[in-house]
Amino acid sequence: MSQVSRESKVALREVTKENLRDIFRLEVAPEQSHFVATNEMSIAQAYFDREIAWFRAIYADETPVGFLMLSDDAKEHRYFLWRLMIDTRYQKLGFAKQALEILFDYVRTRPGAKELLVSYFPGEGSPQGFYEKLGFVPTGEMEGDEIIMRREL
């Protein structure tokens, strides 16, 4: 494991056959596991939703530290943060925030992009406060048991 710190440069990189196993090894803390699907499940889901799934590994310098996936529906001009996870060893270092800033810049380049949506399961340990700090606000809508939030771009 490489040494990473708050000063590490965050980048989004393609998931390839060379880094796939490293991405599969990333895990959230046990108490967070019911809030986000595993990276294996996310990548499998992306395979079946190829037309809209855009996913990347989150790197801090040369170390894979997380994963994100976007529902990138340019036809409908709908952009939804589908997955976001940072490995438990690398949480609280600002990597998720930096990765989302990169994602915001990417989504701004997409056709008709005016906002980014996200959803979360409420409860202790949920990412609600994290998303609020990044400017997401509740839409008043639900998707199943998940609360939907939006952030203007």
Question: What does each model-identified segment do?
Answer:
Residues 2-3, 143-153:
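Terminal substrate-recognition subdomain of acyl/acetyltransferases
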Residues 107-119:
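Conserved GNAT acetyl-CoA-binding A-motif
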